[in-house]
Amino acid sequence: MTSQAATTTTTAAAAAAWTREDDKAFENALAACAAPPPADGGAPDDDWFAALAASVPGARSAEEVRRHYEALVEDVAAIDAGRVPLPRYAGEESAAPPDGAGAAAAASKDGGHRRDERKGGGGGYDGGKSCSKAEQERRKGIPWTEEEHRLFLLGLDKFGKGDWRSISRNFVISRTPTQVASHAQKYFIRLNSMNRDRRRSSIHDITSVTAGDQVAAQQGAPITGHQATGNPAAAALGPPGMKHHHHHHPGGAPPPMPMYSAAPMGHPVAGHMVPAAVGTPVVFPPGHAPYVVPVGYPAPPAKMHQ
């Protein structure tokens, strides 16, 4: 008799085991079939449990559904009374559970209906919404360095405003396009803000990729990306017409003689050479006929024979 009773108990326990799918189906049926208020303040009547069992797959009997319902009520009461410890999240120090928490967790009886099993996705909440300290530090963001900001200015001058993906891929490879766009927004807000003398210094005050950024920001036009020049240093050098050409003549030599003018006195001549009447070579304009009278410096007069 003892062996037969043990076998019967094991079979009943196996039949009473509820899977996660069974729990979900039971919860859906419980939400669809609202329990009528009992007259004596106790559990609902047998007819309601029979209707609830018909909505639960797996051929559960009304008695099994009743035990499962009572286990659920006990779990909810234990949680409301504070006898169930709250789940620990990443980064929090582990604390010993309060007294009676283990007994409350074990008091769910043979239904096997644990709150930590019921929430299913709630168990994923511990790993889904919570994150490690390293993940939290990464989400806080790492401040931009001056080198990254200068690379951003190079990319802004190259690809223009709005092409953050190209700037991220070709210049600021350590930042994502979203981070580049956020940095650009702060940069333009800083560029257009008022009261520049009163505000604190920031990396967004750097508006040029050359040395002396603070002076360049006050005297020259900052990089805005509206006109991509392809050469970041072109804005700092200025337009080609602003360059000054200084001609240095080594050795103190006189400047070269113009092409279409007469040779000055005592100046060596070169070019289209023809013999002059007085024996002095002169310069003729190219393409002119040789009958033009050359202009040369006067020769000393010949001595008169007496």
UniProtKB/Swiss-Prot annotation:
A motif (Nuclear localization signal 1) lies at residues 133-140. Transmembrane segments: none annotated. Expressed in aboveground tissues, with the highest level in leaves. Induction: Repressed by sucrose and gibberellic acid (GA). Coiled coil: none annotated. Residues 164-188 bind DNA. Residues 136-192 form the HTH myb-type domain. PROSITE patterns: HTH_MYB, MYB_LIKE. A motif (Nuclear export signal 1) lies at residues 72-86. Residues 110-120, 132-142 have a biased composition (Basic and acidic residues). Residues 89-142, 228-255 are annotated as: Disordered. Gene3D superfamilies: Homeodomain-like. Residues 18-73 form the Myb-like domain. A motif (Nuclear localization signal 2) lies at residues 196-200. InterPro entries: Homeodomain-like_sf (IPR009057), Myb_dom (IPR017930), Myb_dom_plants (IPR006447), Plant_Stress_Dev_TF (IPR052245), SANT/Myb (IPR001005), SANT_dom (IPR017884). Keywords: Activator, Cytoplasm, DNA-binding, Nucleus, Transcription, Transcription regulation. One of its GO terms (molecular function) is DNA binding. GO terms for biological process: positive regulation of DNA-templated transcription; response to gibberellin; response to salicylic acid; response to sucrose. Its main location: nucleus. It holds the Pfam family Myb_DNA-binding. It is found in: Nucleus; Cytoplasm. A motif (Nuclear export signal 2) lies at residues 203-215. Transcription activator that binds to 5'-TATCCA-3' elements in gene promoters. Derepresses strongly the sugar-repressed transcription of promoters containing SRS or 5'-TATCCA-3' elements. Functions with GAMYB to integrate diverse nutrient starvation and gibberellin (GA) signaling pathways during germination of grains. Homodimer. Interacts with GAMYB. PANTHER family: TRANSCRIPTION FACTOR KUA1, TRANSCRIPTION FACTOR MYBS1. This is Transcription factor MYBS1. The lineage of its organism: Eukaryota, Viridiplantae, Streptophyta, Embryophyta, Tracheophyta. The gene is MYBS1.
